[in-house]
Swiss-Prot record:
Keyword Transport tagged: no
Pfam families assigned to the protein according to its UniProt record, in alphabetical order: IPPT
Entry-linked InterPro entries: Dimethylallyltransferase (IPR039657), IPT (IPR018022), P-loop_NTPase (IPR027417)
Subunit description: Monomer.
Gene: miaA
Name this protein carries in UniProt: tRNA dimethylallyltransferase
Binding-site positions, substrate: 12-17
Keywords: ATP-binding, Magnesium, Nucleotide-binding, Transferase, tRNA processing
Site (Interaction with substrate tRNA): 101, 127
KW ATP-binding (keyword) present: yes
Required cofactor names: Mg(2+)
């Protein structure tokens, strides 16, 4: 029997952490972060980690598990998340995956092989190389490769191209989990307003000092490439004013949110909820209850 898990995804600033905590309290659960940046110690504000009070109220996993000088990949996430979910389940609790790194979460849910002859990073690099292509361009690649896909969709096209490229199906046919995937969304203007406001709050909380610490110590590491830090480096180098760097960060975050939504919409089977609608949290909790009772 597959392990039932709750997955909460969505763009940045939409309220994933708050919902995950509420779900954990309601259904005796623990939260597993599905965020590629929250793994780094010392990067708290720019990665929007759950506050110490929130982490004290509900146990969070895969936060602060790497130093800023260490790398972290989808391979690492899948390996560690699997062990974490198994531990949570063994204690009779519900695992709630919450985050915005679509590649990591999709890799976990679809049961990608972590062994085999083809290096996992090579597989992920190939998948990432297909992301910029439009549906029409993917269809053309499929045709060029001599492949046939009944009822074309983006996911089928990418899987077919992957199998043709590597000569084997690199996904497990049997996954470990039965997920309920909830994707939070908001009206675009409202979401962008939330993003801008959250960036302002981050600066008030000390983001500039946190980013300067990273800039002074390790400006070229993987951790420094995440949105929330690298946009401020031109300011530290004297190439931009603070106002310019702040606006650059807000713009980059808005663009990132758009890419996140595109990923979840095209690559994962999610149930969308508009956070601005009346009674949305009650409807989400009811759906989770029905899913767990089924």
């Amino acid at each position: 029997m597959k392990t039932k898990i709750i997955v909460i995804v969505g763009p940045t600033a939409v309220g994933k952490t708050a919902l995950a905590i509420e779900v954990a309290k309601r259904f005796n659960g623990e939260v597993v972060s599905g965020d590629s940046q929250q793994v780094y110690r010392g990067l708290d504000i720019g990665t929007a980690k759950a506050s110490p009070e929130e982490q004290a109220a509900v146990l969070h996993h895969l936060i602060d598990v790497r130093e800023i000088t260490e790398s972290y990949s989808a391979f690492d996430f899948v390996s560690e998340a699997k062990m974490t979910i198994e531990d949570i389940h063994s204690r009779g609790k519900l695992a709630i995956i919450a985050g915005g790194t679509g590649l990591y979460i999709q890799s976990l849910l679809e049961g990608y092989h972590l062994g085999g002859e083809t290096p996992h990073e090579e597989i992920l690099a190939y998948r990432a190389s297909l992301e910029p292509y439009s549906d029409e361009e993917l269809a053309h690649l499929v045709e060029q490769a001599g492949l046939e896909i009944p009822q074309f969709n983006r996911r089928r096209a990418m899987r077919a191209l992957e199998i043709a490229h590597f000569g084997q199906d690199l996904e497990n046919q049997e996954t470990l989990y039965e997920p309920l995937i909830i994707c939070l969304d908001d009206e675009r203007s409202q979401l962008y307003e939330r993003i801008n406001h959250r960036v302002d709050l981050m600066f008030e909380a000390g983001l500039l000092d946190e980013a300067k610490w990273l800039f002074d110590h390790s400006p070229n590491v993987q951790a420094a490439k995440g949105i929330g830090y690298k946009e401020l480096f031109p300011y530290f180098r004297g190439e931009q004013t603070f106002e310019e760097a702040s606006e650059s960060l807000k713009q980059a975050t808005r663009r990132f949110a758009k890419r996140q939504l595109t990923w979840f919409r095209n690559r994962m089977q999610v149930t969308f909820y508009q956070i601005g609608e009346s009674g949305v949290q009650d409807r989400i909790l009811s759906q989770i209850e029905e899913f767990l009772d089924d």
